[in-house]
């Protein structure tokens, strides 16, 4: 990987994939500078080199310049704040004005605008999958053979397309399905909240599934669909019977533990 010769900036929000990215850099002897987004970055094992508030996010370009960094990667979750709750400095206000037209048009348009700002500043945004190859979802653990009396390949494909169609409205990456229809859709509160809302319904469904895919127009440098042990635990406790996920475009947190739990709880899993 070409970045081995230069320092990499990891711009990190919350979630366990941040630590996976750090470990990958260490294994490959990639020098990195970790920028944690305040109130989102939550890794206690590896404190960030700098903790940057969204109120001062406009300072990020001078920070990168001072560190002589050109290559950057985004990893982890950052909830889009309500603008009325921000107290930005003057430089951040300038960048907010640049993205204002896109702020309320959905995450995809907003993230692409942010991506283009970094490019125009001379930075190269890298695909985090290059660092997390062992975390990319594949079909190695597909277990359809154990559930052939419950679901068919045709139904799997249909549910996958339902999730993609839902994602085309830029409202979320995940849906819960059963009986050839969408029962609930993800909103800005995320996948675990979607599962919680399903649990509150106390439904008795035939074979409800969580389906998670990238959105059709998604910028793949940000916010890839993610599945990990916490979500698997929540799926099981909610009564959902399994997961369909998009292979190659999704990331698995702690694959060993994740698939161990899927097997333990006898959950359906299919990467399509």
Where are these regions (language model features)?
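General beta-strand structural signal in soluble alpha/beta enzymes
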Residues: 10-12, 34-36, 72-75, 125-130, ...
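N-terminal basic/disordered segments at the start of proteins
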Residues: 3-37
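Short glycine-rich anion-binding loops that position phosphate/pyrophosphate groups of nucleotides
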Residues: 77-80, 215-216
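Ser/Thr/Gly-rich flexible loops in soluble cytosolic domains mediating phosphotransfer, phosphorylation
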Residues: 88-130
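Selective hydrophobic functional segments
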Residues: 70-73, 83
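Conserved mixed alpha/beta catalytic, RNA-binding, or beta-rich assembly cores of soluble enzyme
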Residues: 15-18, 25, 51-54, 104-108, ...
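Short acidic, glycine/serine/threonine-rich loops at helix termini
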Residues: 21, 44-46, 84-87, 137-140, ...
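Feature captures the catalytic cores and cofactor-binding loops of soluble hydro-lyases/lyases
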Residues: 37-69, 86-99, 193-272
